[in-house]
């Protein structure tokens, strides 16, 4: 279930093509994660939360805004490896993306990331980490891309209960 929490909660204007089934009554839609692009991305992003289950292999792109113009890498990315999840954000104040890597277990993992303008915070299940980070998240031409990014294996697995917020949500507590 992919849910728009910010703003009106409406998802009927999200370009999914034939990859998703929209349920406007509940304000959600189900998506097969296979290079699905949701964009353009509003960079007032505060948090991403999801449950992720990936097959075990080399690092896989779960969600990012890569594959833009001029070979720019993503400024927002969540990727997963055999036993970890990596979160990265590139801001106007960094030369390279700030990254946090947190251990993950086989099967579903509760994954969340928050950038509050002062820190990048991430959590996988009950393990939380944080690093100082300031600046605006760099804009990219690409919207959010689920399941693919140049230089990474395509995501093979499942994403459940994906949520994006424009505020700091209560789940972080």
UniProtKB/Swiss-Prot annotation:
Region (Disordered), start-end ranges: 1-23
Tissue: Component of the acid-insoluble and acid-soluble organic matrix of calcified layers of the shell (at protein level).
Domain of life: Eukaryota
Gene Ontology CC, one term: extracellular region
Subcellular location per the Swiss-Prot or TrEMBL entry: Secreted
Keywords attached to this entry: Secreted
Identification of the protein by name: Uncharacterized shell protein 26
């Amino acid at each position: 279930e992919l849910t728009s929490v910010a703003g009106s909660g409406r998802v009927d204007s999200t370009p999914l093509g034939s990859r998703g089934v929209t349920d406007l009554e509940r304000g959600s839609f189900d998506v097969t994660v296979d290079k699905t692009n949701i964009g353009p991305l509003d960079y007032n992003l505060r948090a991403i939360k999801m449950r992720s289950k990936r097959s075990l292999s080399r690092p896989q792109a779960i969600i990012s805004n890569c594959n833009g113009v001029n070979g720019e890498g993503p400024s927002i990315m969540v990727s997963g490896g055999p036993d970890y999840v990596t979160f990265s954000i590139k801001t106007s104040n960094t030369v390279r993306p700030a990254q946090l890597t947190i251990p993950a277990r086989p099967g579903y993992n509760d994954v969340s990331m928050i950038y509050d303008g002062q820190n990048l915070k991430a959590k996988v299940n009950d393990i939380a980490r944080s690093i100082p980070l300031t600046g605006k998240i760099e804009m990219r031409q690409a919207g959010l891309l689920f399941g693919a990014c140049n230089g990474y294996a395509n995501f093979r697995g499942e994403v459940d209960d994906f949520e994006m917020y424009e505020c700091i949500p209560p789940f972080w507590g």
